[in-house]
Amino acid sequence: MSSEPPPRRARGPGEEQNMTEIDAFPRREIFDPTEKYKMDHKRRGIALIFNHERFFWHLTLPNRPGTSADRDNLRRRFSDLGFEVKCFDDLRAEELLLKIHEASTASHVDADCFLCVFLSHGEGNHIYAYDAKIEIQTLTGLFKGDKCQSLVGKPKIFIIQACRGSQHDVPVIPLDVVDHRTDTPDANLTQVDAASVYTLPAGADFLMCYSVAEGYYSHRETVNGSWYIQDLCEMLGKFGSSLEFTELLTLVNRKVSQRRVDFCRDPNAIGKKQVPCFASMLTKKLHFSPKSK
């Protein structure tokens, strides 16, 4: 009996060849699950922090006391990791877009990555500048490969601490401190904000970090800053140069989710919790190893 395989049947009219699209691309010989992003360029990269505490009156958005603590905390932590940190306060939408455009058209050839933080109110797929809202995808889109060639294949990290300023902005007075006084200007009040910023995909090598997942609440203390940024900065201080970054973000999720409002004068705020989230389009492991001097 012949061992030869039977001849292939000729395709009839209208029949298409069964071929996967990936066959058109060269295959990698070795797939390394431990592969890391190259983080030994001349410089770490730029970290932009857009901080918004006050807003144009016509937007009817409340101020965000405590956000300057977030800004300063982030500036210290990212500087420690080797970033060139640039902070901007209460920019108008046109000014903010100009700064983003300048960053996207700058050369990042000798940089490891790019990082951008927004501290503001948010709604849907927008965040608020001083005088208008801006679509998040408008901002991230400027850093995609066709717009920003020098960041192709490099991590692009966006951190969004955005909470909705509406009827859910309930001041919560912590009563678990013996000497707490609500009539002092420095009282550290907690504000409970409804989550309303959608998690949006951005593209390959993007990492989108959100202070709160949809359906939960975002908390910001008027003196110490937001829960999310407080815990993010604590984890960056402890593990920023040693732990893989998405693993660090998972620790942040855990720490924030363990917080709760236990004692307050508003009974509706008791038990409110917060769960951050991140959407990773990274293709390799991300480590902020110390830069050599």
Swiss-Prot record:
Gene Ontology cellular component annotations, sorted alphabetically: cytoplasm; nucleus
Domain of life the protein comes from: Eukaryota
The organism's taxonomic lineage, starting at the top: Eukaryota, Metazoa, Chordata, Craniata, Vertebrata
Location of region: 130's region: 125-142
Stretches for region Tri-arginine exosite: 42-44
Notes concerning its domains: The N-terminal disordered prodomain is required to prevent self-activation. The Tri-arginine exosite is required to recruit substrates for hydrolysis.
Protein EC: 3.4.22.59
Modified residues (Phosphoserine): S79, S257
Region of interest: Disordered: 1-20
Function statement: Cysteine protease that plays essential roles in programmed cell death, axonal degeneration, development and innate immunity. Acts as a non-canonical executioner caspase during apoptosis: localizes in the nucleus and cleaves the nuclear structural protein NUMA1 and lamin A/LMNA thereby inducing nuclear shrinkage and fragmentation. Lamin-A/LMNA cleavage is required for chromatin condensation and nuclear disassembly during apoptotic execution.
Name of the protein described by the UniProt record: Caspase-6
Gene (name only): CASP6
Compartment(s) where it occurs, according to its Swiss-Prot or TrEMBL record: Cytoplasm; Nucleus
A Pfam family the protein falls into: Peptidase_C14
EC supergroup of this enzyme: hydrolase
Annotated catalysed reactions: Strict requirement for Asp at position P1 and has a preferred cleavage sequence of Val-Glu-His-Asp-|-
